């Protein structure tokens, strides 16, 4: 059902006028999607959303959330449990300090029988929770991270997995991404000066940074010791997991590939959830530039001028 709406939307283009027209149309598509999907889900009860299929490695979808988002998270959960390619696990991580009773929120209980697992973690690592704790528990799995406010089309997971199968296994796969631009000093330019959305670029490339909202697939063995340095995460980029993961890719020689050069944007489940959006906060306050500067200094062994 969601795939049908995404099929109606226009992919992002380099031409600004075309993009402006496409934005207006896509805004209408998003509005209709948000209004009709809950009714569709009520009329078509969920079946089991996970499977025991043996893939190249266990296929796990992982995400996190927080109390303010829980009332609207159901649509995202529905969209993941209705994938045409079923994962082996769907994990939702919640911080114990935000959910001290360690009880599954009422809004989520109906999804447990369909395959959702809700787990409680000791430390609130903000957006890092969605990858950190799953990678710690299942290091040899294929881990797909998603956002808790996005409606994912039924073919989303299949598209990521097929791109992974057709790529070098030292490649991170994403739907959406930005292209890092390098300055005259052979260091990354400011975050807001990058090639946002990397329109027309598919990769694989060292300079593509996956955009978490679109969904990202990390191959088995991607998460090394450096990734689990909680102190470094806290000190440098607690609110920017995308940047931390990008530097892990660069440290260990992983390139990034998009599933398609001209990607389609993803749509949130509810308009009002945007006020809690981490990306909006980081970008609006230019905090990503601070996080980026911190990481460039910490990982000064990266030779930016050699990246392609």
Region spans (language model):
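A conserved hydrophobic helix/loop-capping motif in glycosyltransferases and polysaccharide synthases
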Residues: 60-68, 83
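C-terminal catalytic/acceptor-binding lobe
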Residues: 2-40, 56, 225, 232-308
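Active-site-proximal specificity loops/subdomain of glycosyltransferases
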Residues: 93-141
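Residues at the starts of beta-strands that form the adenosine-phosphate
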Residues: 88-89, 142, 255
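Short, acidic, metal-binding catalytic loop of nucleotide-sugar glycosyltransferases
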Residues: 76-88, 96, 110
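Cell-envelope/extracellular polymer assembly enzymes that use nucleotide-activated donors
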Residues: 57-62, 89, 244
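Short beta-strand-to-loop acidic/aromatic patch adjacent to the donor-nucleotide binding site
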Residues: 140-151
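Conserved catalytic core of nucleotide-sugar-dependent glycosyltransferases
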Residues: 134-135, 153-230
């Amino acid at each position: 059902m969601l795939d049908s709406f995404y099929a109606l939307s226009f992919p992002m283009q380099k031409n600004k006028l075309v993009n402006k027209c496409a934005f207006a149309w896509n805004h209408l598509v998003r509005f209709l999607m948000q209004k009709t999907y809950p009714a569709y889900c009520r009329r078509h009860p969920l079946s089991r959303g996970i499977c025991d299929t043996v893939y190249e490695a266990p296929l796990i979808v992982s995400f996190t959330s927080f109390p303010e988002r829980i009332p609207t998270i159901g649509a995202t959960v529905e969209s993941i449990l209705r994938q045409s390619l079923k994962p082996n696990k769907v994990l939702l991580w919640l911080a114990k300090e935000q959910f001290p009773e360690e009880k599954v929120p009422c809004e989520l209980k109906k999804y447990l029988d369909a395959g959702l697992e809700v787990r409680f973690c000791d430390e609130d690592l903000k957006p890092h929770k969605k990858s950190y704790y799953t990678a710690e528990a299942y290091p040899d799995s294929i881990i797909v991270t998603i956002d808790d406010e996005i409606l994912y089309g039924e073919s989303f997971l299949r598209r990521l997995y097929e791109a992974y199968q057709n790529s070098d296994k030292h490649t991170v796969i994403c739907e959406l991404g930005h292209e890092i631009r390098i300055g005259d000093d052979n260091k990354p330019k400011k975050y807001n000066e990058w090639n946002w959305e990397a329109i027309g670029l598919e990769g694989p490339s060292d300079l593509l940074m996956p955009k978490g909202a679109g969904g990202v697939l990390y191959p088995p063995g991607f998460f090394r010791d450096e990734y689990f340095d909680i102190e470094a995460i806290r000190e440098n980029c607690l609110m920017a997991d995308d940047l931390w993961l990008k530097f892990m890719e660069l440290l260990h020689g992983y390139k990034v590939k998009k599933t398609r050069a001209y990607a389609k944007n993803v749509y949130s489940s509810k308009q009002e959830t945007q006020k809690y959006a981490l990306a909006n906060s980081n970008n609006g306050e230019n905090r990503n530039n601070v996080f980026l500067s911190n990481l460039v200094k910490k990982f000064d062994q990266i030779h930016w001028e050699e990246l392609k």
